[in-house]
């Protein structure tokens, strides 16, 4: 199977649709949100963000940072900036102005046919625990990949 890398211009179009109030469904690549999102396999639904509502703890905003569009976990605030960390990342925290937040992750569509509502309180609590395990993620992530968890 040939891998197709979609240029960032596609995500610009998705961002524009979100700004127009439309939801978008995207096939994601990359491993920065593993194990919650499997890059190259899962699809996600992103809904528009109103630009006003305070973020729900552990939600996953869609935003532009460093010229790229991303979905990472919201982990807190630093003044007016939202702090983000990918579930598969160990150290790099992005600080994003609220005006750069375009949408919020609503649903993950897994390849096995299951769907994950990203507003579900149990899912958000699991994300919080995963964040607390940052110090041992370097060992857990390879183990999870090996076991296909």
Enumerate the predicted regions with their spans.
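Extended hydrophobic leader/signal-anchor segments used for secretion and membrane insertion
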Residues: 1-149
């Amino acid at each position: 199977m040939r891998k197709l890398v979609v240029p960032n211009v596609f995500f610009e179009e998705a961002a524009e649709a979100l700004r127009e109030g439309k939801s978008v469904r995207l096939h994601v690549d990359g491993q920065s949100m593993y194990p919650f999102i499997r890059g190259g396999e899962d699809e996600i639904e992103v809904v528009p963000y109103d630009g006003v509502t305070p973020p729900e703890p552990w939600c996953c905003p869609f935003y532009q940072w460093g010229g790229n569009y991303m979905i990472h976990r919201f982990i807190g605030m630093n003044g007016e900036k939202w702090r983000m960390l990918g579930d598969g990342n160990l150290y790099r925290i992005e600080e994003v102005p609220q005006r750069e937040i375009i949408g919020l992750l609503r649903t993950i569509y897994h390849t096995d046919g299951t769907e994950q509502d990203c507003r579900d309180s149990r899912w958000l609590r699991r994300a919080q625990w995963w964040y607390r395990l940052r110090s041992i993620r370097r060992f857990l992530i390879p183990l999870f990949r090996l076991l296909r968890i």
